[in-house]
């Protein structure tokens, strides 16, 4: 095989694996409930709104634990002075 053919085969394999990984990630995402339509009975609308509320709660739920602690760590490092990381004297305004 030519080196160019090997390179294209490798790129094709990587692209295929990327699509497979993205496909598995989207399967874990909840699906939006189907709208029963305008002339639906009250029971169907109640089921739909209950399912829609559950769907919105799943998507917008707050995540605690490792994820929030990493966000806190990054914001602490970016903001600068916190209780655990006091400002150093070199970050103070220099007086000449």
Swiss-Prot record:
It comes from Carassius auratus. PANTHER family: NEUROPEPTIDE Y/PANCREATIC HORMONE/PEPTIDE YY (PTHR10533), PRO-NEUROPEPTIDE Y (PTHR10533:SF5). GO terms for biological process: feeding behavior; neuropeptide signaling pathway. It comes from the Eukaryota. The keyword Signal applies. GO terms for cellular component: extracellular space. NPY is implicated in the control of feeding and in secretion of gonadotrophin-release hormone. Keywords: Amidation, Cleavage on pair of basic residues, Neuropeptide, Secreted, Signal. Residues 1-28 form the signal peptide. It holds the Pfam family Hormone_3. It is found in: Secreted. GO terms for molecular function: neuropeptide hormone activity; neuropeptide Y receptor binding. Belongs to the NPY family. InterPro entries: Pancreatic_hormone-like, Pancreatic_hormone-like_CS. This is Pro-neuropeptide Y. Its main location: secreted. Gene3D superfamilies: 6.10.250.900. The modification Tyrosine amide is found at residue 64.
């Amino acid at each position: 095989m030519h080196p160019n053919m090997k390179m294209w085969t490798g790129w094709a394999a990587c692209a295929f694996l990327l699509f497979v990984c993205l496909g598995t990630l989207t399967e874990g995402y909840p699906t939006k409930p189907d709208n029963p339509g305008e002339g639906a009975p009250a029971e169907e609308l109640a089921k739909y709104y209950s399912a829609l509320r559950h769907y919105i709660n799943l998507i917008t739920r707050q995540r605690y634990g490792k994820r929030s602690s990493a966000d806190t760590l990054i914001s602490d490092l970016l903001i600068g002075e916190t209780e655990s990381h006091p400002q150093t004297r070199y970050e103070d305004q220099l007086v000449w």
